[in-house]
């Protein structure tokens, strides 16, 4: 199982580059850069990371088909991959209606079909072939004007529901959302046949289980609200009525931390003392997870987070 780190999107862009260098020095396999709206642009940060590092893999997770024309995504990815000398993995995902439609005014229709269409078009352009067809409703007649001196980046899809997971079979891998449990990873692997699975994971350990719990509780409650009743919460063992309460609290703008139990947190995050946290990491390995991406909490010192994560993974 590969180990990766994801600098928080609200970190200064230059700081994110420094953190990536620290992750490389600490022996991490990959660094993942998110593109959440409206935070720092992932391609700019990835270019900085590519120029400042020499070994570590660089993942962008994920870019959506709505805000960037397919030609622009191919241009950016190919150029970034050249700087990285073939170390880039490009993650593509459908995003969500709140960001696209409510915030940016972009119609959010047929997200899965749009993502699949867009992914195929990006792959065509990155392979050096000409694209001559409708892509997301636009007639595209184009090809890259240059031939990169390295293989094209891997394409992975950020997906979570059964329909999206089934549609991702043509990708080089899948990126699972935060709070993917070992049970969910195992289900994805066995049900959909995905062999290279990456997942964002919340990690918070301390000398006592209670301290580790407190540091991760607010984020766990928030993301449980985001997922609501779904395969992610079901495979983590949450009854539908419990998962629904987290969703209701999020929509009402109220904290749901009081709904959490130690069992719930342990099912979706790496937390507690070192023994319990290491056991959860081992469960991820046994589930078939290919890459565990530790999410930066945006508050703690990055060096300490990197040290703790590396200590938990028996590699």
Q: Which residue ranges define each predicted feature?
A:
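Active-site-adjacent structural elements that line small-molecule/cofactor binding pockets in enzymes
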Residues: 1-315
């Amino acid at each position: 199982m590969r180990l990766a780190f994801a600098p928080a999107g609200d970190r200064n862009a230059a700081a994110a580059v420094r953190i990536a260098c620290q992750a490389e020095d600490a022996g991490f396999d990959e660094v993942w850069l998110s593109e959440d709206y409206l935070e720092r642009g992932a391609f700019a940060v990835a270019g900085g990371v590519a120029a400042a590092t020499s070994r570590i893999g660089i993942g962008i997770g994920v870019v959506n088909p709505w805000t960037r024309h397919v030609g622009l995504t191919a241009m950016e990815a190919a150029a970034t991959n050249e700087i990285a000398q073939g170390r880039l993995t490009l993650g593509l995902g459908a995003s969500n209606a709140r960001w696209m439609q409510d915030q940016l005014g972009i119609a959010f229709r047929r997200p899965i079909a749009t993502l699949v269409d867009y992914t195929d078009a990006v792959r065509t352009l990155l392979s050096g072939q000409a694209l001559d067809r409708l892509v997301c409703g636009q007639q595209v007649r184009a090809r890259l004007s240059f031939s990169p001196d390295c293989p094209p980046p891997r394409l992975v899809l950020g997906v979570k529901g059964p329909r999206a997971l089934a549609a991702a079979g043509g990708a080089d891998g899948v990126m699972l959302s935060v709070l993917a449990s070992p049970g969910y990873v195992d289900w994805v692997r066995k049900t959909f046949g995905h062999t290279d699975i990456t997942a964002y994971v919340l990690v918070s350990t301390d000398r006592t289980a209670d301290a580790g719990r407190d540091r991760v509780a607010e984020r766990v409650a928030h993301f449980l609200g985001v997922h609501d009743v779904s395969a992610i919460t079901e495979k983590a063992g949450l009854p539908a009525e419990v998962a629904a309460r987290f969703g209701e609290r999020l929509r009402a703008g109220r904290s749901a931390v009081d709904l959490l139990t130690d069992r719930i947190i342990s099912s979706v995050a790496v937390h507690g003392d070192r023994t319990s946290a290491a056991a959860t990491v081992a469960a991820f390995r046994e589930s078939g997870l290919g890459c565990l991406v530790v999410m930066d909490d945006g508050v703690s010192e990055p060096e300490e987070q990197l040290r703790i994560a590396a200590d938990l993974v028996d590699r």
